[in-house]
């Protein structure tokens, strides 16, 4: 399991949101509390976040963005091409990172082995050491609470930060909202 972060992605009726906490841990020591582990890609049309080794994640972001540009922003094609490249490259297969990527139509988890997984419900995914806590909270809030997409992500990450020692409550989010 990758320690040191929690990333949650949510695709709601009016917008898609990605959020992450700010904690960077090394062993049992907190090195930084305000890191940003989420990004906007392709001029803000795609949202992405990572869990795992920071250096590995930046390499993956760069590679994914290059592939995303070559597919002219088609997220589905990009994740498939990314997975193919990841699986055939011996160096990439040793990287210790996972990514979540989403737009308004799709949400995908890209694993450290090159797997591409679209969540069963098509709208909520989480990675990192606090990912299961955030995922459970997001599912409950999605089902029972009357809150907007951004509040759902922030509250779910806050809950994860209160439970997981590798996750804090310094939360950053990015959003893609539907045009009005």
Curated annotation (Swiss-Prot):
<dbReference type="InterPro" id="IPR022281">
    <property type="entry name" value="ATP-dep_Prtase_HsIV_su"/>
</dbReference>
<comment type="function">
    <text>Protease subunit of a proteasome-like degradation complex believed to be a general protein degrading machinery.</text>
</comment>
<keyword id="KW-0645">Protease</keyword>
<feature type="binding site">
    <location>
        <position position="167"/>
    </location>
    <ligand>
        <name>Na(+)</name>
    </ligand>
</feature>
<protein>
    <recommendedName>
        <fullName>ATP-dependent protease subunit HslV</fullName>
        <ecNumber>3.4.25.2</ecNumber>
    </recommendedName>
</protein>
<dbReference type="GO" id="GO:0005839">
    <property type="term" value="C:proteasome core complex"/>
</dbReference>
<dbReference type="GO" id="GO:0004298">
    <property type="term" value="F:threonine-type endopeptidase activity"/>
</dbReference>
<dbReference type="InterPro" id="IPR023333">
    <property type="entry name" value="Proteasome_suB-type"/>
</dbReference>
<feature type="binding site">
    <location>
        <position position="161"/>
    </location>
    <ligand>
        <name>Na(+)</name>
    </ligand>
</feature>
<dbReference type="Pfam" id="PF00227">
    <property type="entry name" value="Proteasome"/>
</dbReference>
<comment type="similarity">
    <text>Belongs to the peptidase T1B family. HslV subfamily.</text>
</comment>
<keyword id="KW-0378">Hydrolase</keyword>
<keyword id="KW-0915">Sodium</keyword>
<keyword id="KW-0963">Cytoplasm</keyword>
<dbReference type="GO" id="GO:0046872">
    <property type="term" value="F:metal ion binding"/>
</dbReference>
<dbReference type="InterPro" id="IPR029055">
    <property type="entry name" value="Ntn_hydrolases_N"/>
</dbReference>
<keyword id="KW-0479">Metal-binding</keyword>
<feature type="active site">
    <location>
        <position position="5"/>
    </location>
</feature>
<feature type="binding site">
    <location>
        <position position="164"/>
    </location>
    <ligand>
        <name>Na(+)</name>
    </ligand>
</feature>
<keyword id="KW-0021">Allosteric enzyme</keyword>
<keyword id="KW-0888">Threonine protease</keyword>
<dbReference type="GO" id="GO:0009376">
    <property type="term" value="C:HslUV protease complex"/>
</dbReference>
<comment type="subunit">
    <text>A double ring-shaped homohexamer of HslV is capped on each side by a ring-shaped HslU homohexamer. The assembly of the HslU/HslV complex is dependent on binding of ATP.</text>
</comment>
<dbReference type="GO" id="GO:0051603">
    <property type="term" value="P:proteolysis involved in protein catabolic process"/>
</dbReference>
<dbReference type="InterPro" id="IPR001353">
    <property type="entry name" value="Proteasome_sua/b"/>
</dbReference>
């Amino acid at each position: 399991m990758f320690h040191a972060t929690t990333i949650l992605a949510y695709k709601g009726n009016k917008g898609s949101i990605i959020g992450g906490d700010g904690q960077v841990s090394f062993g049992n020591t907190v090195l930084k509390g305000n890191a940003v582990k989420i990004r906007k890609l392709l001029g803000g049309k795609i949202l992405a976040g990572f869990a795992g080794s920071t250096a590995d994640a930046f390499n993956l972001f760069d590679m994914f963005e290059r592939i995303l540009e070559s597919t002219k922003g088609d997220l589905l094609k990009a994740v498939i091409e990314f997975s193919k490249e990841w699986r055939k490259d011996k160096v990439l297969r040793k990287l210790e990172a996972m990514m979540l990527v989403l737009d308004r139509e799709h949400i995908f988890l890209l694993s450290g082995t090159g797997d591409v997984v679209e969540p069963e419900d098509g709208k909520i995914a989480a990675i990192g050491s606090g990912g299961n806590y955030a995922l459970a909270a997001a599912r409950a809030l999605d089902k029972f609470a009357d809150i907007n997409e951004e509040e759902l992500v922030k509250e779910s990450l806050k809950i994860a930060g209160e439970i997981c020692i590798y996750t804090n409550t310094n939360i950053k989010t990015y959003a893609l909202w539907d045009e009005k």
